[in-house]
């Protein structure tokens, strides 16, 4: 019989009441060296008092923690009730899509629009499907920078929308997406909506752009067929943050550039742009700079901003043990009595600046709430091991503060197509009516 090896779990509920000597041992693990070699961190209580800090002012690449700044920026500029509007217009034989910058329009959203078009009696477009520069469907992993290659962008997005509109063009994943949406929203899964595009696809010129069409014919008058309005902004931000989706950079088309985001934070905090704060992207890709202390300040600012609207961090960030996404790389944080105690954001880069993995958020303990940022710089060759070390650090912190205070999971993270609104203008009355 193989003897069992004793394991000291400083993050367990039992650790919260262990004898004094063992408690001291767990606290030593939080000190420089110990089991945390290579980590840097900064921790504050709910009121902003520094609890502990190790290289908290070290300039680091924050990776996807930049998405916290982008979320704050979007909320301040647009407000929590904001919905992105996408208009579907009839223009002669063509269907024109005027995007409103919705960064999270998916095939599921296209299914709902197709159903609305069907209700209006539209099942076939004899002309073309044209989309403008502010329309996206599906994901690009942050590669689609707004404003770059508008012709290529329009061609790709129009082709995706055409496929989503026509079940005969669906692949297996698109069909599965329809069945899941139908199940969630009580639709007839055996009768999917269908809008066939008989003509080609391409770019719809922006309304403000002066351009002569290649065809020597007048541009026909347009009429609104359907207006699709996204779910309110917080739900969209939560989806991007939970999956650490770099397509959050699509918000630049609505808000401004990464340089504008940097200026927003610098002016808001009244600090200079230097190696403590330097942003080159709104997604976290590239060589951005932030300190652990400023990452915690960013979390606090986001938390306080959300509270103005009776919201909290869990409305825009995932909850360990409750939500899908990248927090599952830290599985112990959502188990047992810890479930619901931690709300946060992950960040990782494999090669840039030697690689880094970070975890920042708020954790509820028996001693109160704590805001934290922990990072493992130069960990590109061993991200999994670095995440395990960060997880152990946070478990030990919880234990030192009396243990985690778990909570029931709240409203589930919205799925694609959930929470949207459709405006379907009444068809024009026949002449003489």
Regions found by a protein language model. Give the residues of each.
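Active-site SXXK
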Residues: 62-80, 129, 240, 372
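Acidic helix-start/capping segments at beta-turn-to-alpha-helix junctions
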Residues: 85-103, 128-140, 213-218, 223, ...
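A small/polar active-site loop signature that marks catalytic segments
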Residues: 146-150, 160-316
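Polar, glycine-rich mid-to-C-terminal structural blocks
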Residues: 103-177
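Short, well-structured active-site flanking segments
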Residues: 76-92, 309-314
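Small-residue-rich helix-loop
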Residues: 51-53, 255-433
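Sec/Tat-exported extracytoplasmic proteins
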Residues: 73-82, 99-101, 108, 117-124, ...
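A short, well-structured edge-of-sheet supersecondary motif
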Residues: 29-54
């Amino acid at each position: 019989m193989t003897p069992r090896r004793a394991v000291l779990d400083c993050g367990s509920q039992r650790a919260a009441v262990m004898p004094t000597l063992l408690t001291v041992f767990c606290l030593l693990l939080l000190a420089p060296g110990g089991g945390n070699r290579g980590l840097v961190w900064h921790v504050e209580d709910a009121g902003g008092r520094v609890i502990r800090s190790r290289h908290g002012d070290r300039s680091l690449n924050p990776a996807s923690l930049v998405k916290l700044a982008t979320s704050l920026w979007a909320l301040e500029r647009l407000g929590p009730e904001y919905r992105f509007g996408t208009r579907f217009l009839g223009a002669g034989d063509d269907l024109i899509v005027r995007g409103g910058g919705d960064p999270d329009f998916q095939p599921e959203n296209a299914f709902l629009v197709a159903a609305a078009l069907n209700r209006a009696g539209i099942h076939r477009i004899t002309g073309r499907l044209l989309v403008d520069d502010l329309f996206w469907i599906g994901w690009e992993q942050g590669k689609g920078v707004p404003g770059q290659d508008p012709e290529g962008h329009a061609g790709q997005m129009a082709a995706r929308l055409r496929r989503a509109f026509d079940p005969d063009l669906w692949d297996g994943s698109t069909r599965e997406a329809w069945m899941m949406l139908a199940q969630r929203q009580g639709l007839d899964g055996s009768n999917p909506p269908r809008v066939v595009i008989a003509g080609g696809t391409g770019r719809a010129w922006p309304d403000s752009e002066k351009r002569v069409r290649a065809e020597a014919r007048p541009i026909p008058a347009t009429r609104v067929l359907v207006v699709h309005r996204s779910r309110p902004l917080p739900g969209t931000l939560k989806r991007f943050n939970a999956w650490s989706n770099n397509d959050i950079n699509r918000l630049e088309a609505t808000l401004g550039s990464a340089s504008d985001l940097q200026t927003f934070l610098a002016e808001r905090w009244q600090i200079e742009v230097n190696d403590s704060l330097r942003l080159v992207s709104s997604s976290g890709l590239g060589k951005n700079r932030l300190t652990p202390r400023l990452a915690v300040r960013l979390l606090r600012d986001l938390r306080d901003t959300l509270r103005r609207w009776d919201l909290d961090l869990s409305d825009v960030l995932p909850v360990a043990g409750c939500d899908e996404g990248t927090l599952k790389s830290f599985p112990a944080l959502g188990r047992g009595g810890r479930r619901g105690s931690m709300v946060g954001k992950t960040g990782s880069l494999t090669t840039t600046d030697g690689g880094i993995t970070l975890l920042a958020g708020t954790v509820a303990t028996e001693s109160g709430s704590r805001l934290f940022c922990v990072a493992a710089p130069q960990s590109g060759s061993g991200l999994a091991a670095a995440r395990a070390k960060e997880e152990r650090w946070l478990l030990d912190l919880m234990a030192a503060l009396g243990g985690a205070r778990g909570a029931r999971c709240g409203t589930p993270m919205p799925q694609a197509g959930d929470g949207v609104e459709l405006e379907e203008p009444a068809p024009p009355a026949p002449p003489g009516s």
